[in-house]
């Protein structure tokens, strides 16, 4: 009892619900305290609806069936719930780590709320897992992660003119994929008189974003004439690394990227991080892991290569309630435009 009270006071806990044990907390501590003889009593009498924006630790012996508390809280407001198993993510991460050298860095892509897992919680988890870099799509996502005290380097894929200052305010590293974006960032850096680390994207054949071959000389000229831009990495993205039908094209992308990296780095006299492999590339083109690899959907157990080399665990479980079950006769139709037919 005393040991438990000491832990509670040390961890700045705001509320304690005790079930099946007698616990006397000093009312002067300001901790909200309630006590129940059984899980069933707690379910009947506690007002779970008042729990909002809270981090809840459920701990106890299996005999108390605390999973009933979890299920009840999960279903209070949302009848559809996406559960994320962080143990599975950890095991998937370790599976990929076995495929790369100890010296190879890992950039975890946590865009779109970490594919539904929650970008802040995922970032905190990956920080504990000793990930080297995070990548997000938007500055807003990066700011949320920074606000949760993550100190990991964060690359931002897409930046806008109206939020450039946030790059310096939150120590973020933008992807630079065109001369226009480069000039905007450089102009802002010069106005602030503050250096910024950036990631140069080369278009090796995906033809979405990135510097084309004829733009590289101007890129080198601009970077060579400023002290305000630090090239943290040079990278590219493979179009179809998961599909062996396109292996020749993938190899041509890698070969072009190697040449572009050499041209840029040697011209500038720098040695930035070099990376081109995405999740599928780690499995199928392992010899090109270079300085860093980028992991996305693979962390959640999705392997687009369908490789037999690795065994991943699905980290997401989507749970929903069935609203209604009907019995209808053969040849009857269902839904809009009568699209379903029995």
Residue ranges, per PLM feature:
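ATP-dependent carboxylate-amine ligase
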Residues: 1-91, 98, 137-139
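Residue-level signal for inorganic ion chemistry
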Residues: 16, 20, 58, 145, ...
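Hydrophobic residues within beta-strands of alpha/beta enzymes
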Residues: 16, 56, 134-135, 154, ...
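Active-site loop-to-helix "anion-binding N-cap" substructures in soluble metabolic enzymes
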Residues: 18, 23, 36, 62, ...
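Glycine/Thr-rich phosphate-binding loops of Rossmann-like dinucleotide-binding domains
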Residues: 26-27, 65-67, 144, 164, ...
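Active-site regions of enzymes building and remodeling cell-envelope glycoconjugates
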Residues: 29-41, 152, 171-174, 290-293
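Active-site-proximal beta-alpha core segment in soluble small-molecule metabolic enzymes
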Residues: 83, 87-91, 104-273
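Active-site anion/phosphate-binding pocket segments in diverse small-molecule metabolic enzymes
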Residues: 83-85, 90-98, 105-108, 141, ...
């Amino acid at each position: 009892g005393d040991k438990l009270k000491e832990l509670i006071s040390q961890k700045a806990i705001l509320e304690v619900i005790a079930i099946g044990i007698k616990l006397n907390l000093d009312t002067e501590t300001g901790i909200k305290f309630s006590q129940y003889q059984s899980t069933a009593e707690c379910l009947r009498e506690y007002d779970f609806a008042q729990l909002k924006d809270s981090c809840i630790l459920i701990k106890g012996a299996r005999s108390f069936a605390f999973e009933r508390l979890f299920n009840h809280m999960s279903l209070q407001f949302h009848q559809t719930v996406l559960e994320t198993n962080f143990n599975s993510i950890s095991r998937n991460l370790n599976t990929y780590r076995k495929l790369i050298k100890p010296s190879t860095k890992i950039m975890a892509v946590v865009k779109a709320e970490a594919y539904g897992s929650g970008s802040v919680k995922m970032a905190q988890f990956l920080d504990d897992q000793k990930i080297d870099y995070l990548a997000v799509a938007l500055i807003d996502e990066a700011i949320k992660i920074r606000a949760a005290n993550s100190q990991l380097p964060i690359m931002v894929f897409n930046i806008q003119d109206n939020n450039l200052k946030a790059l310096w305010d939150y120590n973020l590293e933008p992807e630079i994929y065109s001369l226009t974006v480069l000039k905007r960032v450089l102009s802002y850096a010069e106005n602030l008189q503050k250096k910024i680390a950036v990631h140069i994207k080369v278009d090796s054949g995906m033809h979405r974003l990135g510097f084309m071959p004829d733009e590289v000389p101007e890129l080198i000229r601009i970077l060579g004439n400023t002290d305000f831009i630090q090239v943290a990495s040079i990278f590219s993205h493979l179009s179809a690394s998961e599909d062996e039908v396109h292996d020749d094209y993938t190899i041509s992308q890698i070969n072009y990227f190697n040449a572009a990296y050499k041209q840029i780095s040697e011209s500038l006299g720098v040695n930035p991080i070099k990376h081109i492999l995405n999740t599928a590339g780690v499995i199928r083109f392992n010899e090109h892991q270079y300085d860093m690899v980028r992991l996305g959907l693979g962390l959640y157990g999705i392997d687009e290569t369908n490789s037999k080399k690795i065994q991943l665990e699905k980290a997401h479980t989507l749970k929903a309630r069935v609203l209604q079950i009907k019995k209808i006769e053969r040849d009857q139709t269902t839904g809009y435009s009568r699209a379903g037919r029995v």
